[in-house]
Amino acid sequence: LANGRQIEFSDKNLGSVFNNQGLKIGENKSSTLYCYPIHSSLKEKNTLLVPIAGEYRLVLADGTKIYANSGSKIRYPDVFAENERVVELEGEAYFDVAKNPARPFIVKTTQSEIKVTGTKFNITSYPDDGFEQVTLEEGSVQVKRKGEVFKLTPGRQYFLDKKSEEIVLADVDPILFTSWKDGLFRFQNMDMLNLSKKISRWYDIRFDFKDERSKKLRFSGAFDRKSSLDEFVKIMESTTDVRFKLDGNTVFISQTER
């Protein structure tokens, strides 16, 4: 909460949530925090922190649904401003925004500002990733960065390379970037370095590459997020030239010799 007080959500800790003023601001149930509309002039901001190997859903008072992926932070106010609805994201989240043309919905990341009135889209913006992605599934989106505005239509993706600051707009299959919220990992020609980052946030492990060429190997496929780490390793080793060796909380990755 705004004063630093933390409330842990779990299946054993369900029930009402109150803010610093003692006002009931939501209900925690079934891995979802349902926010309630309240009347307050303070407009305090709360932060939802999703741990590594976790995921959570947030339903805002306006009806907007947010699916937060592991290792993500979402900052949102108890009460939205009269002319706009603003939240802040660090990590990855899927947004199903309630339509309200008079009060646009804005997501701020460390790199960009994404503005919509009602739509479905995914944002990936982890601090330790070398990129930021905005993938549009339905509706329309405007991505603003350093004064420049990029408009997306369904099936289009905004990709920012943080190092070079190059921006690429491309046609993609949105399901490849949104299926995580439905319990699936999907990858299409993804290099092993970026794939390992996604996997490490889910299994709470660290990957160590024995050689640079292993990082550049690419993988296409899908598997259930409920799969164990052992099952994931078996899938990868049976479909790629990569070998995994688990030592404690670290997975060493190498390429098989031919």
Predicted regions and their residues:
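A residue-level detector for the "anchor" residue at the start of short, highly conserved motifs
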Residues: L1-R258
